[in-house]
UniProtKB/Swiss-Prot annotation:
Induction of the gene: Expression is positively regulated by the dothistromin-specific transcription factor aflR.
Protein name, as recorded: Versicolorin B desaturase
EC number(s) given by UniProt: 1.14.19.n5
General function of this protein: Versicolorin B desaturase; part of the fragmented gene cluster that mediates the biosynthesis of dothistromin (DOTH), a polyketide toxin very similar in structure to the aflatoxin precursor, versicolorin B. The first step of the pathway is the conversion of acetate to norsolorinic acid (NOR) and requires the fatty acid synthase subunits hexA and hexB, as well as the polyketide synthase pksA. PksA combines a hexanoyl starter unit and 7 malonyl-CoA extender units to synthesize the precursor NOR.
Organism per entry: Dothistroma septosporum (strain NZE10 / CBS 128990) (Red band needle blight fungus)
Pathway: Mycotoxin biosynthesis
Catalytic activity entry: versicolorin B + NADPH + O2 + H(+) = versicolorin A + NADP(+) + 2 H2O
PANTHER family the UniProt entry points to: CYTOCHROME P450, CYTOCHROME P450 MONOOXYGENASE ASQL-RELATED
Residues linked to a glycan: N266, N426
One of the record's GO cellular component terms: membrane
Keyword annotations: Glycoprotein, Heme, Iron, Membrane, Metal-binding, Monooxygenase, NADP, Oxidoreductase, Transmembrane, Transmembrane helix
Cofactor list: heme
Length: 520
């Protein structure tokens, strides 16, 4: 049976139609529809604010009422600025949108990311991180069982033994980078270091991931795949907002012209590289040696323990982003922060030049125990984490306890790197670059070091952590041994004031470089 409001609405429409004024009728229908939408929106906001299961969590009024402010921030690439401000204002537990909570403490890392026997895993949000265009999983987007399989297959490449195998390759490209910088040193002009670091790291990951360089340093220009990666990630952010609104099919029509086809371009580079790699026989000393043994070059031997061809493709794309952009960002951040703090730069340079008499002495192994250099990297990752836009996890069926409170199933939850590391209740003088805090913990006894997890925790933590640390230490050590570096403040501005779409949209970093006396 129809309700009284339905009958009244129908009667009103019939009355309008009987007047014969079609234009007035259309306007009236539009007005009624608009009023209904407005009423629905107001009712939804009231529910979200006062009756939703997450209503007790603090957060900014408009963000608790509607997901619209969140979507706008995501599209603008300014979410990290909001998280930093909100967590400082509202504390370590924050309601970021009606169905999402953001945390800024150590306990949340354990409750959300750590393995708990008998409890289902908090999987990554499938709306924020959908499957690749071919519909196949990767180490980044997979269920628990398949993630373990991918992790096992790539585990050898990122082990200590694998790192020793890759040492010669990484050293070779670090030395090539020193030669490239020599061309622009002492010319009286500033050098844009983002491009140079990208070239060095991208060539290195090319050799490690596919057995061949991208030849960026040889050609003295950025490979187009780097641009495709950034455009793809920006288009993914737009697609996510459209997907959350149920109108993802409209995405191609909404995307700016320069972003259309970005995802396809990104995967086309991966397809070409992985196909070329699979044609090579014998061990190449790269990430794929064990995968191919288990799977065959075309995935034809995959019995459930290897990978299909589609999985190889998706993982290749993930490895390039994870192994290049993140390390390049850390190198840029460390160089900028050191140049901003001459006393810290002096300490880092003193440690490096005091230990090594020649560049040949600087190897992956010899830089392992560089105390101050490692502290510089750790403090850089606190102030400028390589993956600032970490996707949230989804609370499993039945709900779970996070930070001592029950959280309903399907709620999005996550730990904000930026929100955590800049919160004054977690780190003393949190906006200052102080590498010493990672050497002498008594310097700031109230600092919450357990909340500092730039590589994440649990079974899905960064598989390339050891490789990244080794590469960062090596390239920074060689660069600071060979060159005196000062910041061109006028051309650079505030380098850390950047937007993010999953990774940093890095602004230009201008440095003046001169060959050090010990390198002449």
């Amino acid at each position: 049976m129809s309700s009284a409001p339905d009958l009244a609405l129908t009667a009103r429409l019939v009355q309008l139609l009987q007047t014969g004024n079609i234009f007035t009728t259309i306007l009236s229908i539009f007005g009624i529809a608009l009023s209904a939408v407005a009423a629905w929106g107001i009712a939804t906001c009231v529910y979200n604010l006062y009756f939703h299961p997450l209503a007790s969590y603090p957060g900014p009024f408009l963000w608790r009422a509607s997901s619209l402010p969140w979507k706008i921030a995501l599209l603008k690439g300014t979410m990290h600025h909001d998280l930093m401000r909100f967590h400082e204002t509202y504390g370590p537990e924050l309601r970021l949108k009606p169905d999402e909570l953001s945390y800024a403490n150590a306990q949340a890392w354990k409750d959300i990311h750590a393995h708990v026997p008998g409890r289902p895993e908090f999987l990554k949000d499938p709306i924020r991180l959908p499957l690749a265009p071919n519909g196949v999983m990767s180490i980044l987007v997979s269920d628990t069982k398949n993630h373990a399989r991918f992790r096992s297959l790539f585990g050898h490449a990122f082990s200590d033994k694998g790192l020793r195998t890759q040492q010669k390759t990484i050293n070779t490209y670090a030395d090539q980078f020193m030669e490239v910088l020599k061309e622009v040193a002492d010319n009286g002009k500033s050098v844009e270091m983002v491009n140079y670091y990208n070239m060095a790291v991208f060539d290195t990951i090319g050799a490690l991931a596919f057995g061949e360089s991208f030849n960026s340093m040889r050609d003295r220009k950025i490979h187009p795949w780097v641009d495709a990666i950034h455009k793809n990630l920006k288009s993914v952010a737009i697609s996510h907002v459209m997907r959350s609104m149920g109108i993802e099919p409209l995405t191609p029509y909404i995307l700016p012209k320069e972003l259309r086809g970005a995802r396809a371009n990104n995967y086309s580079y991966a397809i070409a590289k992985i196909n070329n790699r699979m044609q090579k026989t014998g061990e190449q000393g790269d990430f794929w040696d064990r995968v191919i043994v288990k799977s065959g070059a075309e995935g034809e031997m995959n019995d459930g323990s290897g990978m299909s061809k589609g999985e190889m493709l998706n993982n290749a794309a993930v490895m390039v982003v994870g192994g290049s952009e993140t390390s390049a960002s850390a190198l840029c951040g460390a160089t900028y922060l050191l140049a901003q703090s001459p006393d810290k730069m002096k300490k880092a340079v003193g440690e490096i030049r005091g230990k090594f008499k020649s560049s040949d002495e600087i190897t992956l192994h010899s830089v392992t125990n560089m105390e101050y250099l490692t502290a510089v990297i750790d403090e850089t990752l606190r102030m400028y984490p390589s993956v600032p836009g970490q996707p949230p996890r989804v609370v499993p069926k039945g709900g779970a306890t996070v930070c001592g409170k029950f959280v309903p199933e399907e709620t999005r939850v996550g730990v904000s790197h930026i929100g955590t590391y800049f919160a004054s209740y977690n780190f003393t003088r949190s906006h200052e670059f102080i590498p010493e805090r990672h050497i002498d913990k008594s310097l700031f006894p109230d600092d919450n070091y357990a909340a500092y997890q730039p590589w994440s925790v649990g079974v899905r933590n960064c598989i390339g952590k050891n490789l990244a640390y080794a590469e960062l230490r090596l390239i920074l050590a060689k660069t600071l041994w060979h060159y005196d570096i000062t910041l061109d403040r006028e051309k650079t501005g505030d380098f850390l004031d950047q937007k993010i779409w999953s990774i940093w949209a890095k602004r230009e970093l201008w440095m003046k470089i001169s060959l050090a006396e010990n390198a002449k």
